[in-house]
Every structure is written in structure tokens, then in C-alpha cells.
A protein has these predicted regions:
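Divalent cation-coordinating acidic motifs and surrounding scaffolds
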Residues: 26-344, 383-384, 449-454
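Feature for long, exposed domains in two main contexts
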Residues: 342-456
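Boundary/junction segments of secreted and surface-exposed precursor proteins
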Residues: 19-32, 344-361, 454-470
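Cellulosome-associated attachment modules in secreted, modular CAZymes
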Residues: 452-512
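Acidic active-site catalytic centers that drive phospho-/nucleotidyl reactions
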Residues: 36, 64, 198-200, 258, ...
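Bacterial N-terminal signal peptides that target proteins for export
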Residues: 2-13
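Short acidic, glycine/proline-rich loop/turn micro-motifs
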Residues: 166-168, 362, 488
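Acidic glycine-/aspartate-rich tracts in secreted/extracellular proteins
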Residues: 38, 72-73, 85-86, 115-116, ...
């Protein structure tokens, strides 16, 4: 048996090792990006394509979901879809959620239809005048292709909060933050939440940030910074690797205005998961933090208080860096992204047919089970291990586990014993083995074990099975007289005296 029976602490260690993501390669799992794209109404085609699909040192942004702010119109959003689908290296499967024209600039949801299912959009409206939120907040609800459970869904709040550091600006951001948290608290607790975009917040001590991330009586709407990097970000070189603004303007790179805050459930070690060591502070000495998939795309830390470094940019190289500066258009932002690992998918034999089983015997069977996650879609590193145990009906004996399996390899093989051939009348038998897993869609997968009861050996030819009697002798003589293969007990292809001797010997010995 090649089944990989494990203890649970091994699973935790495996998840920790898998979380180390050196280099933030695109392709595996689900990559979600946010980008304030600077008053966009079309154009900048080459720069956007290079920024998104350009490659440097095997790295590319290549998101699966792109949530944009400062989109000016439906035509602007449609232009983005066209630009992404026509970009060299694009899979060409980009679609957009509905565009809603609110006050000021707006958000847009772009997503790859091969990976993402659009579920709906909800608006948290802006406030009139200058009293609160200057722009609508969009909540985009999405699911994953191939998954149905609520725990695989995401509700993403796209924000573009009030700019400025004055007390009035901060008060208006607080109003917006409260509105987001109040809405998130009403969602089903199983749904994952995320807030992303241009927060325009200078410090984690400001009231809006505390409202979003702080402990409250109802924590269903609480958000967390996956890279655990609080502080006073503005004009502070300690945060030079996570700054996002401004790559092109006179102020230079000195603010962490653009962020992605997430549900704590995305770091609990089960189901849909952040790829990285959730809650571990981001490195302060390198952009290439192996503990995180979270990146401020294009910021290699060499641009503090100046425009984005192009020549010698160690994260994205000159071509992508120039494209990012051009898209920012003199007062813009860098994209931010992170990667999520999708849950494992349990798969197993649906039926194990033991065939003909001699009455009263105990026979062995084999069951294949393991991780059937779609590696063609999500990549082997983008799918969580599946963990499972086995539970069997009476008459079946199997090691319950627990077990773990990674996607993309061969399934585990489990041997079991079946003591089911107990019907002297013959006929079929059946029993079930249940595969109990952490697959959110199929927590219980039932495997049917079937077979047919036959005589205890070849001379036990008639019911009741398990006893050699007058009826077995009649059955043998009848088969012999008709020249049937069933009477060829010695298997030499000829019905003769030696078959009669063989029957007599077996008859005398009886059933085991």
C-alpha cells in the first residue's frame, strides 16, 4: 500500500513550506491585483500591456482578477478589456463586471472567465456634497470556476477614499470605512472578504484604518493586513518596499496608499488561502520577500522619495518600470497584488467491484483516493493539499488515516478487507466506504463496494452455499452430462473420470 498516512502536525509543516513563495511567479493559484489607473478613459495600450504581461527575470504581473480605480466611463472599461485580451502573452479570456457610473471616478472589475465566475455587484453609495465618502464603494462578489461552496467565494470592496491628511479628510474616510465594515458584517460568515484599492491613508493609526482592522464585538467584517506592516507609512524609508505612490510625480515614492486587506480566514490554513506566511511582517531589507506573494508591482525599494527607478530596477527591469511610470501619468499609483491558493478537490473510485467472492471468505480490495484539483487551470502550487480520512460500513476493514495528498501526482492506494460473502443464498452484496475530506464542496464522498457471493470452492455448485450436499452433486452431474465447462474441475479441457475424482475429493473435504 502506498497510502501516505500522516499526523496532523506534518500537514501544518507542509503548508508552511509551501507558503514560501520566492519570486512571486504568476500562473499558480488566483492572483488578485488592484490598480488606481489614473483617470482612465482609454489609450495607453502598449504601456498597460507591458505593465501587465511584460516579463522580467521570469516575473510577470499576469493577474487573474484586476480591480481598477479612476476609470472614467464604460468605454474606458471596455478599452481595458480589449487591451488585456490583445496583449502578447494574454490568455485572451478577460471579461468585465457591470460598469456603474457614480459621482466622480469609478471602479471596474476585470477578471479571467476561465478562472472566475462573476456573481454580482453591490454599491455602497457616496455621500452628497463634502460630508463623507466622495465616491461609491463597489462590492464585487466572485466565485471560482469548479467550486460552489460559500467558503470559496470572495466579496471584494473596491475603494478610492478621500485624499488628504487633515482632520476633515480623515473623518470622511472613517465614514466610508464604517460603511464597508457594516456591510461586511451582514455577509454570510463563510464568504471571504477583501478591501482593496486606493485608501489614501497615511498611517495605520488613523481612524479609518483602525475601523477596518480593529477588534469589535462583531468581527465578521474585520480585515487584516496579510503582510502585517502597520506604521506611519508616509515619508518613512522603513516602508520603502511597500510604497505605491507616486511612481511618476514630483513627490516620489513615499506613501502606501494602495493596499489589499483580507479576511482572517484566508490565513487559517484551510480552504481558500493566502500564499505566504499570513501575518508575518514584510521584509525591510528586500522587495523579494520569500514569505509573501504580496507585491507592490515595480517597487524594488530603490525609489524612495523619487520617481520609480527604471534602469537597474531589480524587480521588473526597465521596460516594465517605464510602462508603469507612463500609466501613472504624473500623479498615479503602482499596482498591488497577492496570490491565493484554491482548496484541494477530493476524488476517489466511485465503485470497487470485488467480482465473485467465495462464500465465507475474507477478500482484499483496493481503493484509489486523493487530490483531484485541476492543475491545468490552477497549477500544482496553486492548489492546497487535500486531507481526508476513511470510514467504512460493517464488514469492511480499512485504515482510517488521516491522509494527505497534493494535486498533480498519482492518487493514494488504500487496501481494505471485505468480510461480506455471508449469504448462503448467493447473489450480490454491497457496502460503503466514506471519504471524509476538507474539500469544501464534497466533504463526504461515498465509494460503493460490491460483489457476488459464490460457492466456497468449485465443487460448491448449488445453494445453499457453504455446505456440500446432495444438491451440489446433482448440479455437478447435470453439468457433466451436458458437457458444460463448470464440470471440468481439473481444468484440462476434457470432461472425464478425473473430473469425477476431483469432485469426489472436494466433496469429501467440504467447505473450509
Amino acid at each position: 500500500m502506498n497510502s501516505k498516512s500522516i499526523v496532523w502536525m506534518v500537514r501544518a509543516a507542509a503548508l508552511t513550506v509551501a507558503a514560501c513563495v520566492s519570486g512571486s511567479q504568476a500562473g499558480d493559484g488566483l492572483r488578485i491585483a488592484t490598480w488606481n489607473i489614473s483617470n482612465y478613459n482609454g489609450g495607453r495600450t502598449s504601456d498597460i500591456q507591458t505593465a501587465v504581461y511584460g516579463t522580467f527575470d521570469s516575473r510577470s504581473m499576469s493577474p487573474d482578477v484586476l480591480v481598477c480605480q479612476e476609470v472614467l466611463s464604460l468605454s474606458g472599461m471596455n478599452a481595458l478589456v480589449s487591451i488585456l485580451n490583445s496583449a502578447p502573452g494574454s490568455p485572451g479570456d478577460w471579461q468585465a463586471g457591470p460598469f456603474i457610473d457614480g459621482p466622480d471616478t469609478d471602479s471596474a472589475l476585470l477578471y479571467r472567465a476561465s478562472k472566475v465566475v462573476f456573481l454580482g455587484v453591490h454599491t455602497l453609495p457616496a455621500d452628497p456634497g463634502t460630508t463623507g465618502a466622495p465616491r461609491d464603494v463597489r462590492r464585487y462578489d466572485i466565485g471560482l470556476v469548479g467550486y460552489a461552496a460559500l467558503s470559496t467565494q470572495l466579496s471584494m470592496y473596491s475603494v478610492h477614499m478621500k485624499a488628504g491628511s487633515g482632520s476633515t479628510d480623515q473623518a470622511r474616510r472613517l465614514i466610508e470605512a464604517r460603511r464597508i465594515r457594516d456591510d461586511a458584517e451582514l455577509l454570510d460568515p463563510a464568504i471571504n472578504i477583501m478591501v482593496l484599492g486606493d485608501f489614501n491613508i497615511q498611517s495605520s493609526s488613523q481612524s479609518a484604518y483602525i475601523e477596518l482592522t480593529g477588534f469589535q464585538a462583531n468581527n465578521n467584517g474585520r480585515f487584516f493586513d496579510p503582510i502585517a506592516t502597520p506604521g506611519s507609512w508616509n515619508n518613512n524609508s522603513s516602508f520603502r518596499f511597500v510604497h505605491t505612490q507616486d511612481p511618476s510625480g514630483a513627490g516620489g515614492m513615499d506613501d502606501r496608499h494602495d493596499q489589499i486587506l483580507v479576511d482572517e480566514a484566508l490565513g487559517d490554513g484551510a480552504g481558500l488561502e493566502y500564499i505566504g506566511l499570513f501575518g508575518v511582517p514584510y521584509a525591510t531589507t528586500t522587495w523579494d520577500d520569500p514569505n509573501h506573494s504580496y507585491r507592490s508591482w515595480g517597487n524594488d525599494g530603490s525609489s524612495y522619495n523619487t520617481s520609480l527607478t527604471t534602469n537597474g530596477n531589480t524587480m521588473v527591469g526597465p521596460a516594465i518600470a517605464i510602462a508603469l511610470r507612463n500609466v501613472a501619468a504624473g500623479g498615479g499609483h503602482l499596482p498591488v497584488f497577492l496570490d491565493l491558493r484554491v482548496p484541494g478537490k477530493i476524488t476517489a473510485d466511485t465503485t470497487v467491484d470485488l467480482g465473485e467472492v467465495p462464500f465465507g471468505s475474507v477478500v482484499a480490495g483496493e481503493l484509489a483516493a486523493g487530490n483531484g484539483g485541476d492543475v491545468g487551470l490552477w497549477g500544482p502550487a496553486g492548489i492546497s493539499d487535500v486531507t481526508y480520512s476513511l470510514d467504512a460500513d460493517a464488514g469492511l476493514s480499512i485504515n482510517p488515516g488521516p491522509y494527505l495528498d497534493s494535486a498533480g501526482g498519482s492518487l493514494n492506494t488504500h487496501t481494505f478487507q471485505a468480510d461480506l460473502a455471508d449469504d448462503p443464498g448467493g447473489g450480490s452484496f454491497s457496502a460503503d466506504i466514506r471519504v471524509l475530506s476538507d474539500d469544501p464542496d464534497v466533504p463526504v464522498l461515498t465509494v460503493h463496494v460490491i460483489g457476488t457471493v459464490v460457492g466456497c470452492h468449485i465443487a460448491d455448485m448449488a445453494v445453499p452455499f457453504g455446505t456440500l450436499d446432495f444438491f451440489d452433486a446433482l448440479a455437478f452431474l447435470d453439468a457433466f452430462a451436458q458437457g458444460l465447462p463448470a464440470a471440468d474441475l481439473n481444468g484440462d479441457g476434457v470432461l472425464d473420470f478425473f473430473d469425477v475424482l476431483e469432485f469426489s475429493s472436494l466433496f469429501a473435504a467440504g467447505c473450509p
